[in-house]
Amino acid sequence: MALARLALRNLQQKLSPSLMGQSCERGLVGNRHNPMKLNRFMATSAGEQEDKMNTEVSVSEKKSPRQNFPRRRGRKSLWRNTDDHGYFTPTLNEFFPPTIGNTLIQATENMNRIFDNFNVNPFQLMGQVKEQDDCYKLRYEVPGLTKEDVKITVNDGILTIKGDHKAEEEKGSPEEDEYWSSKSYGYYNTSLSLPDDAKVEDIKAELKNGVLNLVIPRTEKPKKNVQEISVE
């Protein structure tokens, strides 16, 4: 009996619990002379399987750090960037009544159309643009610059505005105890592509109180001949 137990223990150490459970169960079922040994090893195998199941359950119940700290969902934004030009496109009218939402959408589309005509990005255009039936109006703030400091050129459909201003002021004299010298420098440079319907030769510019205004006339579009056809 002792030799049999020793042999089975050695077998148990060499084989995996699942394989040992199957081999022991098959061998002991065929041995009818020792039912006590069968019950003992069946109990041992069942106990090992129960311990293994408990271990697996404890591992499966372990939560990952992401579950302990769930990811926050981002808030919905009223404006989102949906194209390659960087234009703002409004979302659906879920934040405003239909009338206000439609007005915002229409205003955004008009601004995007103006930027398309001038081939510029809203963030690159440091000024204001107005589109009228007969002209375009541009407005730039150039504080510290005079009309002598500003130079406007058009080359191959590109409008360029440059401004350069330097000033030096001295107060007092070297002989006095207090002598002050101050320098100021201003620089402005921007370029944009003119629309196809712009009249380059008729562009006018005016600088007043640090504000530069440009008026770009537009060519008249031919009127479309619309003919109504009666339905019989």
From Swiss-Prot:
Comp. bias regions, Basic residues: 69-78
Parts forming coiled coils: none
PANTHER family referenced in this protein's UniProt entry, alphabetically: 26.5 KDA HEAT SHOCK PROTEIN, MITOCHONDRIAL
GO biological process: response to heat
Protein name: 26.5 kDa heat shock protein, mitochondrial
Start and end residues of each stretch annotated as Disordered: 44-82
Primary localisation category: mitochondrion
Keywords noted in UniProt: Mitochondrion, Stress response, Transit peptide
Disulfide bond positions: none
First and last residues of the transit peptide: 1-42
Pfam family of the protein (one): HSP20
Residue span(s) of domain sHSP: 114-232
Family (UniProt): Belongs to the small heat shock protein (HSP20) family.
A cellular component term, taken from the record's GO annotations: mitochondrion
Start-end of Basic and acidic residues biased regions: 49-64
Subunit architecture: May form oligomeric structures.
Gene (name only): HSP26.5
Organism, as annotated: Arabidopsis thaliana (Mouse-ear cress)
Compartmental location: Mitochondrion
